[in-house]
């Protein structure tokens, strides 16, 4: 039956391996797939592919590697570079889910007659009177719903997140019980195409950007306080690299790449109460003009904070926080929840 055929996206890690095991236990006819997203010489993905292939061999399911390097470069990596050039701090994992991963894998599944796609994300799904809802993973320490805010609402009913109701210890225990070779494999922590975490070196080596473009360091009134080595070295909230010469610590308040300026100020100037969003995506029925009480995550690891969500148009919204938020960073995602349910979110454009 077509509704029992599914693709399982395999990263080579323990979460997707256990997701495959659980889907198989539910009677799904699976095909394992891994997306090759970056040149072999620049990202350590070969071991992950070997691990994914071994998982499929253990489970007795077919496995294939899909080449999406060009699409990934165009839709994710080049946007990553452009965002830094524009003075923003990008979130490539959410962008990849938004523009590439889920839609592409569902399309690949259709070629094989598979209507469902399963992944190892820590998130949950629930059926409601208005359709399928996306919920936070039960293990809030591992919850990955933040990265899924921008996927299409129309595909939720075709997704499965088998480990979303488990915690990490339970996942590893199940992998050990069933003899999966990745039971103790360490989780990946960095951006997949910047495996050493040094984004500055990546911008220099991959994009050929000149990181040494000295400019003025100014305060919020425009007074010149000194000079900086280049805006690409900084992000909002950063203290390191600003030099001394002040009785009070200075922090980056904003970047102005057009004028090659870094705007700095004291700790108290980092706080903002109003955040404007663009490219919004909502996973439930919300309409322009509406206002909703929500909790918001401004970064993946941040705590969800109370705010009022004002919907300005289909693609634009404004958040007014109960308490001012520290170092709100343009280019990052603001993701909105009501209780456990993810409503959606948008990309941070500006603050007040």
Swiss-Prot record:
Disulfide bond sites: 96-192
One MF term from GO for this chain? tRNA-uridine 2-sulfurtransferase activity
Q: List the SUPFAM superfamilies hit by this protein, alphabetically.
A: Adenine nucleotide alpha hydrolases-like (SSF52402)
Cellular component annotations (GO), alphabetically ordered: cytoplasm
Site (Interaction with tRNA) at 121, 332
Active site per UniProt? 96, 192
Q: Which reaction does it catalyse?
A: S-sulfanyl-L-cysteinyl-[protein] + uridine(34) in tRNA + AH2 + ATP = 2-thiouridine(34) in tRNA + L-cysteinyl-[protein] + A + AMP + diphosphate + H(+)
UniProt binding sites for ATP: 9-16, 35, 120
EC number of the protein: 2.8.1.13
What InterPro entries does the entry give? MnmA-like, MnmA-like_C, MnmA-like_central, MnmA-like_central_sf, Rossmann-like_a/b/a_fold
Indicate the enzyme's highest-level EC class.
transferase
Q: Where is this region: Interaction with tRNA?
A: 142-144, 299-300
Q: Which UniProt keywords apply?
A: ATP-binding, Cytoplasm, Disulfide bond, Nucleotide-binding, RNA-binding, Transferase, tRNA processing, tRNA-binding
Localization per Swiss-Prot or TrEMBL? Cytoplasm
For this chain, the family text in UniProt reads:
Belongs to the MnmA/TRMU family.
> What is this protein's function per UniProt?
Catalyzes the 2-thiolation of uridine at the wobble position (U34) of tRNA, leading to the formation of s(2)U34.
Recorded protein name is tRNA-specific 2-thiouridylase MnmA
Q: Which organism is it from?
A: Acidithiobacillus ferrooxidans (strain ATCC 23270 / DSM 14882 / CIP 104768 / NCIMB 8455)
Gene behind this protein: mnmA
